[in-house]
């Protein structure tokens, strides 16, 4: 059997806060709301570059339960660039975040939460950046 699983394609959030969630990913993380197939339920696809990395299901008007956080998933990690600029941007936007350096490495992480309390980890390989 010649089979292998590749990289993460996307993650999905079910929310009653569709507009607020899309706005967070656009304004705070610099992603963009983009094309989405005409499913029979409302939602949005949020893109990083040309790839829809976040699918959002709008569960308003349904009896589906709004989960208070990521459930059994602890967090979602995304590769990022511009460590210092990101820290400054988050501070300017008033977004609570914490910074961590991965031991014995040049990798830094910034952790923050979206409007649905999903924890987002941004990973920066700072050896490729001018200053940290």
Predicted regions and their residues:
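N-terminal beta-strand motif that seeds the catalytic metal site of vicinal oxygen chelate
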Residues: 1-19, 73-78, 128-132
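Vicinal oxygen chelate
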Residues: 1-4, 87-132
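Exposed loop/turn and edge beta-strand positions of beta-sandwich/beta-sheet ligand-binding modules
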Residues: 7, 40, 50, 72, ...
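Histidine-centered active-site/metal-ligand motif
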Residues: 10, 54-55, 75, 109
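Core segments of cupin and vicinal oxygen chelate
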Residues: 14-53
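Conserved beta-strand in the GNAT
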Residues: 55-57, 121
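Mid-chain, well-packed structural core segment of small domains
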Residues: 69, 75-88
């Amino acid at each position: 059997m010649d089979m292998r699983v590749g990289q993460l394609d996307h993650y999905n959030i079910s929310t009653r806060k569709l507009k607020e969630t899309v706005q967070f990913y656009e304004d705070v993380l610099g992603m963009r709301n983009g094309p989405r197939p005409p499913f029979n339920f409302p939602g949005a696809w949020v893109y990083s570059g040309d790839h829809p990395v976040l699918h959002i299901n709008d569960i308003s008007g349904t009896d589906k339960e709004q989960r208070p956080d990521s459930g059994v998933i602890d967090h979602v990690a995304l590769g990022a660039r511009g460590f210092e600029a990101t820290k400054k941007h988050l501070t300017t936007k008033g977004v609570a975040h914490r910074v961590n350096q991965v031991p014995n490495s040049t990798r830094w992480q910034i952790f923050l939460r979206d409007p649905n309390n999903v924890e987002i980890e941004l990973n920066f390989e700072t050896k490729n950046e001018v200053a940290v």
